[in-house]
Amino acid sequence: MRLLSLLFLLFVTAALPAQQKTIHFTNGQWFNGSSFTAGEFYSVNGYLTKSKPAVVDTIVDLKNQFVIPPFGEAHNHSPETDQDLDVYIERYLSDGIFYIKNPNSIPFATNKIAHRLNKLNSVDVLFANGGITANGGHPSTLYPYLLTTTYKKALPGWTAKSFEGEAYYLINSKEELEKKWPYILAQKPGFIKFYLIFSEEYKERKDDTAFNGKKGIDPGLAGIIVKKAHAAGLKVSAHAETPNDLKVALLAGVDEINHLPGYQVRWRGGYTADYYKLDKNIVRLFKKKRVHVDPTYSLLKTELKPVTNEQYKAQVNVQTYNLQLLRKYKVPVTIGCDSYNLTAKTEMEYLQSLNVYSNLELLKMWCEVTPAAIFPNRKITKLQEGYEASFLVLPNNPLEKFDQVYNINLRVKQGLLLW
């Protein structure tokens, strides 16, 4: 099935100009933000309209199936290189994911694949380029390993030193920030990302190599980075690991939080799951600042598994507690899995299993909140007049059986019938 989908995708690429026609979509059950309404739409020049155009090229009978906006992926590190690019594109589209946010990427690599992205027959991606961290900070220590795995074939000739200034920027002071900022902007990032990791222990960890990979920037730089980014018209995402990291980031004025405390527990460092519990003051700050967060809680099952069952249960309890607080205070949650090889489908399946949110809330997170967080200036989150004619068609009502979101019968992107 994957192969057939990929062959179809390649066929669509070749036939693209002829495929974007004026289409009349009839007999659909269209998601209106709270329920489904029977109706019809036309796709004209890639946008939805109720007004009948002079010429209709094609009529598509949706046969009373359920229509929802496409999904977003708030945190992923693919696509990034040309290695297996077709596979990644097909995987996202197959899962109904049209919009992707990559919060740490390599511009040397992404520039080479830019012509393959943000097209009608592909996925739309926003890249942060390299993240801002400090000497010995995450993710700088991760790349020597990735050079032997993920990037082994994709970046021939690269060494561990090649990643500095591409995958990350080492900034330890305000002076270094001022010096490197023009270069960061010259790389044309789609947004800015910086790393806070145990900011409450910054001074103790700063020069201790035992904490390499387990530290981030000086928390005192957070507000300065945000101010400079906003002045340049760029939004800011912050990697946060602890409740204090959240507080620092929120007070600094970031627009988005990557990770919610509890996605990882540093058991070997002597920390317990309860260390990552949020309090009401921080969650109220979330609401006040109108900041959204991508929990990436599925990492507990995919990459950051605890050693014992007791640890696993304790971490799940903290995750559930934190999400219940976010829900109580109506903090917007986006969906992303922080992976190179998985998609947001993994995160959604995991969040669903925690039974914190209703089917309606989960659906809106994935097809409204997440796409809006990636491309806030595009009309992609509703099925209304003047919005992009991009949507997914499901055989049954996902508000009744949520697993229907994984059972997609048709994908349409800006009026282009994919498959």
Can you say where each PLM-predicted feature lies in the sequence?
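Histidine-centered catalytic micro-motifs
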Residues: P69-E80, A229, V236-P243, I257
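Histidine/acidic-residue-rich catalytic or RNA/ligand-binding cores of hydrolases
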Residues: D82-L85, P139, K203-R205, L246-V254, ...
